[in-house]
């Protein structure tokens, strides 16, 4: 029974990994081979496109073209770095103290406010898009990276993740620190941050995976092409440059994979923590 379960899990894992193999194989194919395989798509003719998991004649030409002949790629890569880094830094500055306040202090309307936080967390961007657009327009932040970063900084999702970890800190430990003369700020710095670091890291990993691939907000709020992130670079590659699209997809995927692998253990702790009923 155990072997059967393992076999099924391996099959599903391979199925989930197939798109990655698909991208990697396509990025190593030459223009002629891609044109041959994707002929019905490129020409709009009848029939079905075919595919091979291994290129006939592997080549790095697509990567050379991307990294040496596509300067706009590096501009958009840097835009993605600035967007993601700015959002995550802002969420740490705003979200960590907010989560600590929810977890360690009692105040009137706390439960109602937390319910509002959860409701906001569940709302998709499409619901908030018009109001965000109008506010950013009044503030003069449309068509700026700040206009993308600022609303995301105040996302309630990282607060929800970190709140669970801060709430789990034993009260006896807090009392012992108070007896040693620690004030509320030092409790936060010396006790809260070290013990809540798994929650902070898991929130940052999830945030990176979301904001690295951000597409709806840039499409709605950015008009200048030089401000676009990588998520808008890929859809604008023509079908005739399929190899370039595959290579760009692999390069864009790598940071997300590396961050996920580095923070996987913390991410699992965050998922388990948020699944525990209060």
Predicted regions mapped to residue ranges:
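A structural signal for multi-pass alpha-helical bundles of membrane permease subunits
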Residues: 5-278
